[in-house]
Amino acid sequence: MPGKPSSFASLHDVELCSYAAAGEGRAFGELARRHGSAVRYLLRRMGAQAAEADDVAQDAFLTAFQRIAEFRGEGTFAAWVKRIAARQYLRRLQRERRLTELAAESAEDEEVVGGDADHRIDLDEAMKVLSKVERLCVSLCFGAGLSHSEAAEALNLPLGTVKSHVKRGLEKLRTRLAPADGAVLEGRRGNG
């Protein structure tokens, strides 16, 4: 690898990963600076409080730094670190035994909240109408780019259950975010 650049800000993520794998901490610092808010935003969407999102994001970047040599560049660094963060957050939930409570809450939260075209809200507000399990499933499949199978494995739920939560969550979001003219919103899943 050629000499170290004076500034890492102009380098592509793949180049930064190479420098970081060679032990250059400043290169990884630039990666964390670039992608830290997106990771925290994903965690907030998954239901983490601000301080908890900060803690999990910090842990995820520490894990990514320790495992940077494992990053093969098959996807983006951003997607890789988001998957690490999502999995760490889910493990945290499991440790606190919240997943059992989430499944019970899901049954109670079956009512669909309709959207009033005059009072349309943004996606963050719309996500609040989802049950916690729906929010987790939608966030993992669309925010972190996991497949339904990967989300099912991460949540330790049957594949069909995850698909149902995603479908129901998307229906609620479409209803809540429906444009005034009644046009249908199209959803797109992330990579994975």
Please give the residue ranges for each predicted region:
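Helix-turn-helix DNA-binding module
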Residues: 128-136, 140, 144-161, 172
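Short, charged helix-capping/linker segments at alpha-helix termini
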Residues: 2-7, 21-30, 40-59
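Sigma70-family region 2
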Residues: 21-22, 47-48, 58-76, 95-96, ...
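C-terminal edge and immediately downstream basic/flexible tail or linker adjoining helix-turn-helix-like DNA-binding
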Residues: 2-7, 153-154, 170-192
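Internal acidic/polar
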Residues: 5, 9-13, 91, 97-125, ...
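Short, small-hydrophobic-rich alpha-helical interface motif
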Residues: 20, 39, 43, 53-64, ...
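Arg/Lys-rich amphipathic alpha helix in sigma70-family domain 2
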Residues: 66-73, 83-103, 179
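Amphipathic, Lys/Arg- and hydrophobic-enriched alpha-helical face
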Residues: 30-50, 67, 127, 176-179
